Amino acid sequence: MLCLPVFIILLLLASPAAPNPLQTRIQSNLIRAGPEDANIKTDKRVISGLLASILVPLIDAIIG
């Protein structure tokens, strides 16, 4: 009789402790990947587009 509650408690404690294999594989791949693999390099077009969207309205407001 006492075996069943102990088994259920152990089962509940063990199930969240088991790692998700997909998640651990993705994490290990991200750790091993360098910035060039993840394509983190800044693109000049992105920066120029951001500057243009900020500076053009600012200059228009100053001029008139």
UniProtKB/Swiss-Prot annotation:
Record localization: Secreted
Modified residues (Isoleucine amide): 63
Lineage: Eukaryota, Metazoa, Spiralia, Lophotrochozoa, Mollusca
Additional free-text comment from the UniProt record: The mature peptide does not contain cysteine residues.
One Gene Ontology term, aspect cellular component: extracellular region
Leader peptide range in chain numbering: 1-19
Family label: Belongs to the conotoxin T superfamily.
Protein name, as recorded: Conotoxin VnMLCL-033
Keyword Acyltransferase in record: no
Gene Ontology MF terms in the entry: toxin activity
Predominant location: secreted
Superkingdom in the source lineage: Eukaryota
Residues excised as propeptide: 20-43
Keywords: Amidation, Cleavage on pair of basic residues, Neurotoxin, Secreted, Signal, Toxin
Tissue and organ distribution: Expressed by the venom duct.
Keyword Signal: yes
Organism in which the protein naturally occurs: Conus ventricosus (Mediterranean cone)
